[in-house]
Amino acid sequence: MYAIVKAGGHQEKVEVGDVILVNRLDAKKGDTVEFPVSLVVDGDKVTLAAADLAKVSVKAEVVNDEAKGPKISIQKYKNKTGVARRKGHRQKLTIVKITAIA
């Protein structure tokens, strides 16, 4: 059984026991969070109807609330003027473990 959930502005395919990275959530380590479901597949049975999906919930436990993504370097350059700028960014992430699809 797996589900497609909306987590942190993205859609993720999850099963029970999966550990996923999502954009920073407002939750502390050890908290339980619930994600809205877009699709559920259980063997040959596929659930897409909004009325049926309202009954389904995906629960996850926050494993780490202070993770960071890889460093991304941004460069801006203007030719013949000597203008150059460098900037870096690291996305703040939350690591969650899927505990239940019910």
Swiss-Prot record:
Pfam families (alphabetical): Ribosomal_L21p
Subunit field text: Part of the 50S ribosomal subunit. Contacts protein L20.
Function: This protein binds to 23S rRNA in the presence of protein L20.
Keyword Amino-acid biosynthesis: no
InterPro entries per record: bL21-like (IPR028909), bL21-like_sf (IPR036164), Ribosomal_bL21 (IPR001787), Ribosomal_bL21_CS (IPR018258)
UniProt-listed GO biological process terms: translation
Organism: Bifidobacterium longum (strain NCC 2705)
Family recorded in the similarity comment: Belongs to the bacterial ribosomal protein bL21 family.
Domain of life of the organism encoding this protein: Bacteria
HAMAP family attached to this UniProt entry: Ribosomal_bL21
Stated name of the protein: Large ribosomal subunit protein bL21
A GO term for molecular function: structural constituent of ribosome
Xref: PROSITE patterns: RIBOSOMAL_L21
PANTHER family: 50S RIBOSOMAL PROTEIN L21, LARGE RIBOSOMAL SUBUNIT PROTEIN BL21M
Cellular component, GO, one term: ribonucleoprotein complex
Keywords: Ribonucleoprotein, Ribosomal protein, RNA-binding, rRNA-binding
